[in-house]
Amino acid sequence: MQWEVVIGLETHAQLSTASKIFSGTSTAFGAEANTQASPVDLALPGVLPVLNQGAVERAIQFGLAIGATIAPRSIFARKNYFYPDLPKGYQISQYEIPVVQGGTITIQVEGRKGEFYEKTVNLTRAHLEEDAGKSLHEDFAGMTGIDLNRAGTPLLEIVTEPDMRSAAEAVAYAKALHSLVVWLGICDGNMQEGSFRCDANVSVRPVGQKEFGTRREIKNLNSFRFLQQAIEYEVQWQIAEIEDGRKIQQATVLFDPDTGETRAMRTKEDAHDYRYFPDPDLMPLEIEPAWVERVRDALPELPAAMQARFVSQYGLSAYDATTLTATKAFAAYYEAVVADAGAANAKPAANWLMGDVSSQLNREGIAIDDAPVRPAQLAKLLARIADGTVSNNTAKKDVFPAMWAGEHDGDADAIIAAKGLKQMSDSGELEKIIDDVLAANAKSVEEFRSGKEKAFNALVGQAMKATRGKANPAQVNELLRKKLG
């Protein structure tokens, strides 16, 4: 039997406010346990929550960026459940009327054969809520500690429709969402610190069946790799269970990175289990149209719009445009290079950023803003490749590494001169070298003339070797073909 995978994601993005959503306490990460917990966070008697305007504004920003409806009136609700790190016995969230309704995110997904396809993921909602505290199970022998520093931190919970059909699509969506919230500046996106974490609702059904299968929710996935591994394992587990004649039970499960397996944590609750009701301590949230328009006017150019512009203005592929706009800083670096190098170098600039520059950044674990080679320096190197001063191969192998290491202050011209890397410009000298190569490789000449194209590549290699890589490959090709008839 053929199976179809159905996936929906719920993502918690910690909003980048300086204070908590219902109190003035700091949200800074890493403070000593319980030093950033106000009377509101501790649920002491007689205290009342006060809504943080900055959290609302960030939710509006997100809603506008995904083309959603901003609810003119939304309501906060109490989500009731008991857990040691939730002092009130309920979480303040939104249920019936969320602040952000609908919206879409378009993603680029890599298929099984390496091709890319585009897909639009529909969002159900995004709502404001407070985070819970943290249970520390490993810090005390035989006991659990509670740290309430995180309690009350503002979250935007972003919920999709069950639109994704593979782990690859889920990861592509999560990456696109992560890129967007960081781009907007509403979340720092630090997955290690829990600022961006995903829950994946996964089910399977026979191909062609309209009804959804029974879903299991994988909680608190804080890396894209874990998200992919967890979904892939869960899908295979569910298929095996069904094919063995067992029914899937709705449940909340955890992913164990050490074993690569999911395991059931508890029976999955439905909304009625949380006994939602409007929070009597908070007035309905009223958002004036003028406020929405002020936020809209202040939005930066969004990734989707910039991607479309890169395709039309620079002639890039949709994949290249998506990669270059992964972060605002990366996109700005690219545009700075093109501004100096000229539009004719738009595609080479993209190739260099996605190739050699990204490789160095990943190798050293640094961001593009910290790259030792600045846009103007890379633009000069591209200009030297374009005007034939150095070959692309020499630039990659010799010039760029020296620039990255700071030799000659990263100046391409100085490095080329100091290392004697300039391509041969004397066509007479190159012609003599090619004559010598042809004379010394009579067998390859004969094979080429008998129709073996590989022999030509061997001759090119010999010519480049004889010039110690200083010849222009295009010129070598041209002269060889001319002499070989």
Swiss-Prot record:
Record bears the keyword Transmembrane helix: no
Annotated EC: 6.3.5.-
Purpose: Allows the formation of correctly charged Asn-tRNA(Asn) or Gln-tRNA(Gln) through the transamidation of misacylated Asp-tRNA(Asn) or Glu-tRNA(Gln) in organisms which lack either or both of asparaginyl-tRNA or glutaminyl-tRNA synthetases. The reaction takes place in the presence of glutamine and ATP through an activated phospho-Asp-tRNA(Asn) or phospho-Glu-tRNA(Gln).
Family of the protein in this entry: Belongs to the GatB/GatE family. GatB subfamily.
Presence of the UniProt keyword ATP-binding in the record: yes
PROSITE patterns: GATB
One GO biological process term: translation
One term of GO molecular function: glutaminyl-tRNA synthase (glutamine-hydrolyzing) activity
Catalytic activity entry: L-glutamyl-tRNA(Gln) + L-glutamine + ATP + H2O = L-glutaminyl-tRNA(Gln) + L-glutamate + ADP + phosphate + H(+); L-aspartyl-tRNA(Asn) + L-glutamine + ATP + H2O = L-asparaginyl-tRNA(Asn) + L-glutamate + ADP + phosphate + 2 H(+)
Keyword list, A-Z: ATP-binding, Ligase, Nucleotide-binding, Protein biosynthesis
InterPro entries: Asn/Gln-tRNA_amidoTrfase_suB/E, Asn/Gln-tRNA_Trfase_suB/E_cat, Asn/Gln_amidotransferase, Asn/Gln_tRNA_amidoTrase-B-like, GatB, GatB_C_1, GatB_Yqey_C_2, Gln-tRNA_amidoTrfase_suB_CS
Name the UniProt record assigns to this protein: Aspartyl/glutamyl-tRNA(Asn/Gln) amidotransferase subunit B
Native organism: Cupriavidus taiwanensis (strain DSM 17343 / BCRC 17206 / CCUG 44338 / CIP 107171 / LMG 19424 / R1) (Ralstonia taiwanensis (strain LMG 19424))
Self-association state and partner proteins as the record states: Heterotrimer of A, B and C subunits.
Gene field: gatB
